[in-house]
């Protein structure tokens, strides 16, 4: 079973940044240190990141991109339709992963339970290092004037220092901003 990762998305207004570490672990062994778990979709208008089984994540990325195309890039509609399929489809139901998605207007967490959640304070964190990254990001968002990219970088570094399934080989993508 592949496990462990940290994906973090931080938003200030229309500036949204999503980052993830590069570690893929099989059991207690690092199988890969430079995986890309965050990517741009929908002609560079949507950010997406995954936590969970690598094979499952690629299936979900492909399905979600199809939903975005079908619904004209409407993130919320695509996310709701994806969650419906994920929950009801016999094959998809077995996939073990979570998706964080965002465009310039909205950030959402999509789970296999059919959940589509808009985060509090514009921060989404998933994966084994998620709680550490979430704590750091919320503190930096509340008490500093750092931009979302700086917050994502700093928070993922904190998660990598604490979570053994998270490394500091980061992939960071952003939309909007200066």
Swiss-Prot record:
Q: Can you name one GO molecular function term for this protein?
A: threonine-type endopeptidase activity
Q: Which reaction does it catalyse?
A: ATP-dependent cleavage of peptide bonds with broad specificity
First-tier enzyme category under EC: hydrolase
Coiled coil (UniProt feature): none
GO CC, sorted alphabetically, is: HslUV protease complex; proteasome core complex
Catalytic site positions? 5
Q: Which UniProt keywords apply?
A: Allosteric enzyme, Cytoplasm, Hydrolase, Metal-binding, Protease, Sodium, Threonine protease
Q: Which InterPro entries match?
A: ATP-dep_Prtase_HsIV_su, Ntn_hydrolases_N, Proteasome_sua/b, Proteasome_suB-type
Q: Name the GO terms of the biological process aspect.
A: proteolysis involved in protein catabolic process
Write down the EC number. 3.4.25.2
Its annotated compartments are:
Cytoplasm
**Where does the protein principally reside?**
cytoplasm
Protein's job: Protease subunit of a proteasome-like degradation complex believed to be a general protein degrading machinery.
Task: Indicate the family of this protein.
Answer: Belongs to the peptidase T1B family. HslV subfamily.
HAMAP family per the UniProt record, alphabetical: HslV
Q: How does it assemble?
A: A double ring-shaped homohexamer of HslV is capped on each side by a ring-shaped HslU homohexamer. The assembly of the HslU/HslV complex is dependent on binding of ATP.
What's this protein's name? ATP-dependent protease subunit HslV
Species classification = Bacteria, Pseudomonadati, Pseudomonadota, Alphaproteobacteria, Magnetococcales
């Amino acid at each position: 079973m592949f496990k462990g990762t940290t994906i973090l998305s931080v938003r200030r207004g229309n500036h949204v940044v999503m980052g993830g570490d590069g570690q893929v672990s099989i059991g207690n062994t690092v199988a890969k240190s430079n995986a890309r778990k965050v990517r741009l979709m929908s002609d560079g208008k949507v950010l997406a990141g995954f936590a969970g089984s690598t094979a499952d994540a690629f299936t979900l990325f492909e399905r979600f991109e199809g939903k975005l195309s079908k619904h004209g890039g409407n993130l919320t509609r695509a996310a709701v339709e994806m969650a419906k399929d994920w929950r009801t489809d016999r094959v998809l139901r077995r996939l073990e992963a979570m998706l964080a998605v965002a465009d310039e207007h909205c950030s959402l967490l999509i789970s296999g339970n059919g959940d589509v959640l808009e985060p509090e304070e514009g921060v989404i964190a998933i994966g084994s290092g998620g709680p550490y990254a979430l704590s750091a990001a919320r503190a930096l968002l509340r008490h500093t004037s750092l931009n979302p990219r700086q917050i994502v970088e700093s928070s993922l570094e904190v998660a990598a220092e604490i979570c053994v399934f998270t490394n500091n080989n980061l992939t960071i993508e952003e939309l909007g901003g200066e």
